[in-house]
Amino acid sequence: MPRKGPAPKRPLINDPVYGSPLVTQLVNKILLDGKKSTAERIVYQALEQAREKTGTDPVVTLKRALDNVKPALEVRSRRVGGATYQVPVEVRPGRSTTLALRWLVTFSRARREKTMVERLANELLDASNGLGAAVKRREDTHKMAEANKAFAHYRW
């Protein structure tokens, strides 16, 4: 293990169109095979579609969607004796944002719409309204944590 501690976080550059680090993170999550310009096109068109459907600022829609998808608790496996327990732990703010973006992208890819732009736009709109698969994933995660509350004293 390295003795110098964890590597410092690199600062995220705000995206050129909306000036938001969240949009930059979303672009980086959409990214496949290093095709950044394709990822940017998908994200910007999806945000533009969201603006057309709602009539509000797409960054506000994205933030609202993230707030509805961010988990507060998750379970982590902890081995005690011969048994493995699912121990509920609080999620750090940075990790909760990362998980929310990851879930949004994963469930966008699984949707049935024709293009990725439509899928992402509709998943963002669903999430901002408290619907969709990503919000369900968060609720399932919270249910798991609630069900395993008895093992909370094994937290580390």
Curated annotation (Swiss-Prot):
It comes from the Bacteria. InterPro entries: Ribosomal_uS7, Ribosomal_uS7_bac/org-type, Ribosomal_uS7_CS, Ribosomal_uS7_dom, Ribosomal_uS7_dom_sf. GO terms for molecular function: rRNA binding; structural constituent of ribosome; tRNA binding. Keywords: Ribonucleoprotein, Ribosomal protein, RNA-binding, rRNA-binding, tRNA-binding. One of its GO terms (cellular component) is small ribosomal subunit. One of its GO terms (biological process) is translation. It holds the Pfam family Ribosomal_S7. Belongs to the universal ribosomal protein uS7 family. Part of the 30S ribosomal subunit. Contacts proteins S9 and S11. One of the primary rRNA binding proteins, it binds directly to 16S rRNA where it nucleates assembly of the head domain of the 30S subunit. Is located at the subunit interface close to the decoding center, probably blocks exit of the E-site tRNA. This is Small ribosomal subunit protein uS7. It comes from Rhodococcus erythropolis (strain PR4 / NBRC 100887).
